[in-house]
Amino acid sequence: MQVRLGTIIHAVAISALLLFGAAPALAGKTQNIVLIVSDGLRWQEIFTGADPTLLNEKEGGSWLAEGELRRRYWRPDADARRALLFPFLWGTVAKQGQIFGNQTKGSVARVTNGMAFSYPGYNEMSVGFPDPRINSNEFGPNPNVTVFEWLNKFDEFHGRVAIYGTWDVYDNIFNKARSGLAMQTGWTLPHKAHETPRDALLRELYETTTRFDEEDVSNSLLQVALLDYVKDEHPRVLFVGYGETDNWGHQGRYDLVLDSAHRFDHFVRQLWDTMQAMPQYHGTTTFIITTDHGRGSGLTEWKEHGVDEKGSENIWIGVLGPDTAPLGERTHVAPVTQAQIAATVAAFVGKDYSHEVPKAAPPVAGVLNIPRE
């Protein structure tokens, strides 16, 4: 009787685990995950390249001669234009991974926070659900625990989760005071206990560079600090946020939006190549690449975003790594949302975030290809 009762209890326990999803996620090849964001970079540029109506001074605010701007970024064919603007995204990510969000081909990616600006977007992607309380970029410390803070509680990731971003508000979005995550944000001077001449030069550049504004450091300065950190500290979970595409959009400088977008693509390639050249990252690292919100699509609306600018809810998501099937540009698929990013980040490193946080959206379907045993 005792043996039979024990067997029954064991069977019930196993059934409960399967029913409620408490079993651990299946492990794939990914051991390191990187979420990369280019702030306010529209899906239109991602999928069709430079907008011909904005390649001028009148509508695009360009200071660069129109002929030179067209030489750099214009081609008659949309596929050629987008590859010219984003050579890594279309030459590597699209060939070896997947990209969602081309609405002209039946792929919709969108935010669900109803606000379509930065803090609500970063909260949604990092915690897995929108929070109506967060209705301003000046909201203050995030009351929600992000997937990055959550992963940092696991022994295998503790102390190896980092936030690198150009915007100083990331300190609040990822709640630096509570989470204790390693962060390099805004114009905060990079600091190392044992400073090399290279480190001293970088600090000097931070101190002497003329600031675009007091909140956002230049993408290029952050990139140097980021690459050094990756080489020295070997983080396993990493967030990287680049801000210039949004900054120049608000300034109405479409020429510099394109320059920043092109350099963003270069920075992502540079980070990928750097990590793939390191044994601890080679063949075991996944990149998720996206934006926090879209923008308007008219001759003046492209400069702004938010509830009053139609289309600002539309985003794009790219995934590249050893567990992602090379399906390329996704077409005629179910819509995906910004809220799904948090659980997707966790799933790639074998953690079931949606089970732990029931409000969180599930992982993006089809990007994690792990054979079941």
Positions of predicted regions on the chain:
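Bacterial N-terminal signal peptides
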Residues: H10-G21
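Metal-dependent active-site segment of extracytoplasmic phospho-/sulfohydrolases and closely related
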Residues: V34-L35, W43, F264-K303, V345
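Acidic, His- and aromatic-enriched active-site or binding-groove loops in soluble protein domains
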Residues: V127-G140, S179-S218, L222, R263
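Non-catalytic, well-ordered alpha-helical segments in soluble enzyme domains
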Residues: F154-D155, D323, H332-A365, N369
